[in-house]
From Swiss-Prot:
Residues recorded as bearing Phosphothreonine in the entry: T431
Chain intervals with Pro residues compositional bias: 979-995
Protein name listed in UniProt: Zinc finger and BTB domain-containing protein 21
ZnF C2H2-type: positions: 546-569, 575-598, 670-692, 748-770, 775-798, 909-932, 937-959, 1043-1065
Amino acid sequence: MEGLLHYINPAHAISLLSALNEERLKGQLCDVLLIVGDQKFRAHKNVLAASSEYFQSLFTNKENESQTVFQLDFCEPDAFDNVLNYIYSSSLFVEKSSLAAVQELGYSLGISFLTNIVSKTPQAPFPTCPNRKKVFVEDDENSSQKRSVIVCQSRNEAQGKTVSQNQPDVSHTSRPSPSIAVKANTNKPHVPKPIEPLHNLSLTEKSWPKDSSVVYAKSLEHSGSLDDPNRISLVKRNAVLPSKPLQDREAMDDKPGVSGQLPKGKALELALKRPRPPVLSVCSSSETPYLLKETNKGNGQGEDRNLLYYSKLGLVIPSSGSGSGNQSIDRSGPLVKSLLRRSLSMDSQVPVYSPSIDLKSSQGSSSVSSDAPGNVLCALSQKSSLKDCSEKTALDDRPQVLQPHRLRSFSASQSTDREGASPVTEVRIKTEPSSPLSDPSDIIRVTVGDAATTAAASSSSVTRDLSLKTEDDQKDMSRLPAKRRFQADRRLPFKKLKVNEHGSPVSEDNFEEGSSPTLLDADFPDSDLNKDEFGELEGTRPNKKFKCKHCLKIFRSTAGLHRHVNMYHNPEKPYACDICHKRFHTNFKVWTHCQTQHGIVKNPSPASSSHAVLDEKFQRKLIDIVREREIKKALIIKLRRGKPGFQGQSSSQAQQVIKRNLRSRAKGAYICTYCGKAYRFLSQFKQHIKMHPGEKPLGVNKVAKPKEHAPLASPVENKEVYQCRLCNAKLSSLLEQGSHERLCRNAAVCPYCSLRFFSPELKQEHESKCEYKKLTCLECMRTFKSSFSIWRHQVEVHNQNNMAPTENFSLPVLDHNGDVTGSSRPQSQPEPNKVNHIVTTKDDNVFSDSSEQVNFDSEDSSCLPEDLSLSKQLKIQVKEEPVEEAEEEAPEASTAPKEAGPSKEASLWPCEKCGKMFTVHKQLERHQELLCSVKPFICHVCNKAFRTNFRLWSHFQSHMSQASEESAHKESEVCPVPTNSPSPPPLPPPPPLPKIQPLEPDSPTGLSENPTPATEKLFVPQESDTLFYHAPPLSAITFKRQFMCKLCHRTFKTAFSLWSHEQTHN
């Protein structure tokens, strides 16, 4: 193993991504076209799929394998351009006002970094650009606010230079060079448009493979000096370059082949085609290079030179004429300049923002050590303009270090000087009016993989001096258009960056900044200045409304509109549930679907397996959003239902009381003699009596509420002449009559479809034909959209196909021949015209002595919930009835006669599974659904118990690998089938097994006395060979859903529907 050599190229990944980005920008080797709005984006499927869960799921779908054009209608082109630049560069430039849209798009695309972008810290504090604001305050007033890029900039030769010295520079074009050095200078003080400095290019003799460092030099700025036209931008690739006097550097710059050469465009193109070392990964939206001409008009000396330049290159130094500063090196990784769809070129380095970066001539300056190859120097392109030279201050010349082996085509060193000294300089500006104005304070730079390892530059005294003028900052900010100011999204925390106002002991206008960017972050916390600006601007921000073009819903922000369109109007549903294969718009919906439908807490979607799961904080946030949405929906429904009755809350309460009493109609109640309302609890009844002013109630006693509304609604006769127009009740006053009529009107409301009728008789007539009655749970009066939904609700909430025995009481042994049922059948059907009879609640009957019997009014069965838990004692006989009376069947008593009168308090609600008693029915429902320790659904393979059948079904998927023959064999061993009774469920405890009977009376002897319809018989063969036992729900038989799935026991109306459903289990 000693002969093995290991080499690592840390820049390979950056170079690879950079090359891919170049291909994307040029449209080469791209295999997918994304259409967003009115713009088209070319990209590579592999890159998109590796970065986004959405694209991974979209491209891996077999239906989309051959498709190369995709239209994304859930995002805006600007936001998608920012995200695409981030994918190809790992860096992001985004305005504060667009941060919410980028976050939403990152969430929709499944990019975790962008989803949590708000919690990330930007790289550099950009809101403060005091020197620029101070210098260009007058120009901001007069300028046309257009974005500009300098594409051709003049160059002044040194005073000692001659034309003969410059000729070798021009003639030296035959040798292609790795990089080009351009000395550029702008001394024109009053350009009416804000300009961005030129990218200065450097040409060196040094070859790329050498280990060397690049010295980055900023130009000199001398205030008040009219005869200092020379600005030096020097890029040297020596390992160590000590600082030299200005004269020495000018002499060195004059030498041919060092840095003063400006080759022709052809030589530049050759240089561009030569193999280059790895480059940093940056992004640009410009695809076509521009060949521009540079003209020098200084001191009577001019030259025409061709310069290959990318016009939309974003690498510029922010201009500043006042103050001087030293620039530290940002080693935080590659940076993307994506500023309103204006991006960086692939071939340039990006220096960090600085108002001025100057070359300091010092005789005894220490040498600068070389940088690590993984570092990068970055700069931000900023809006800049000129100001009068009297505003300028003295400058310092400082050396700057640039990293080696980072440039692909040419080395970019920037020089921007704003002097009013030499007006002979000519500057050509290429204006881009299509790009809106963007202030640097609206920009946040975020880079993945921050590495603040900048100790290499600590040997040199690298500082930055910023002249701060807070009043100018406020003045400059106030001149910006309102739409370009802070547009903070109310839903997101606002990350404010501070203007550093504390001064150093030497000067209160300057502060020292170390080489580490973390020091920058520490120096820019929130400031009172920005807080005041933000508060003022947010207060004056107009309330814009954004309308969905599909459903015309209105949203406060574009982020909310994007989320709504993505969730509800996106035709593509890339995320699928692994269990039932239902498709959803977002991965989060798959997650919540699996929790609610399959009882699986973890998201089983394969799209999320390749990426990190969202952090807990974000998951809690999403859960809160869903919970808040459900609460709002419930409140809206409550308010809508409460509008016709009492105003505000009282009508909603009254309607809830009506529904609650409709549910307990067969139970004992306190009946109001004024309006006929019945209450189970005395406290509720007393509270209701207070709503009837006048006499105290007469004849209040604990009786059962009869079936018919009219006899109940007739109050005690009195001498007053005020009569209710709905129920002919006579009332004592006009006010009492109005209150009573409102109560009567609410009482005549259909509990299934909420239709209101003039009289209770009309409502009762409608109830028997109401189409929503079949889909209404008679236990809690909830209405569902499908029969499967109500069946699932009855099973999971009310346990109506309960199979577990209860230890608190003993169940009588049922006669399998049907003798008990036949003998008790006539007693269980009293006369239909009987109005008042004593009824005991189903719960009391369950816990009462086995010799007692429950009497039900057959016509009032619609008010009695279908409680299949009565099957523990009662034999259920189901018969075919007409469609409009499909729900009219009721469980009938099968035990011995019961003593008349209630034997237990009706205020106790027992759990049929564990026997625990509750005083409030809501507590019982919550206990049965979530907290009950008895789990009646047993897996026959591992004998594991579950609270609901859906959790059992989800668990059973783990056993699907076993052969179905083995499963059937196990089931036959666990539960042998008797000859005279249907197969009992495979419950682990053997003693209770004979006590539990299935719902369908499919016993051979029982069928002779009590013939069952064909719908019941169809369940028998499917139940006998099922993988795990479930009693068929009574609602399924009633709804004529004759075909049951053996795995999940969902019922279907046709065999084809069952077959289609079974394909989802394969």
